[in-house]
């Protein structure tokens, strides 16, 4: 028996899934399982790299996050939005936290324009969605 089978459905008020979904073989089944475990009106907070961010488009196959072999499910803002909306959640807020971090400086921003072998870290490549469960898929 799996651990998640021991947790009753509609049990959690909030589930955090930070940098998990990009490592999941079947992200649709993963979101459906999260839907089962969150109460109606509860919140799913999910963060993952944005594989269609400005750095991914600029650096293409040299985008740093593509080189992690454990990143098997890649999402853009649009594809994650669709996955969430199609599985009983409404997106309350989207956040791109890099722009509010201590790393968002003029010096770091100028590095974006350097012709590096591989993309510099950060630069808006992470997205966090705050989602409200509206529909029970059980």
Regions found by a protein language model. Give the residues of each.
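ATP/Mg2+ or Mg2+-diphosphate-binding catalytic cores
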Residues: 138
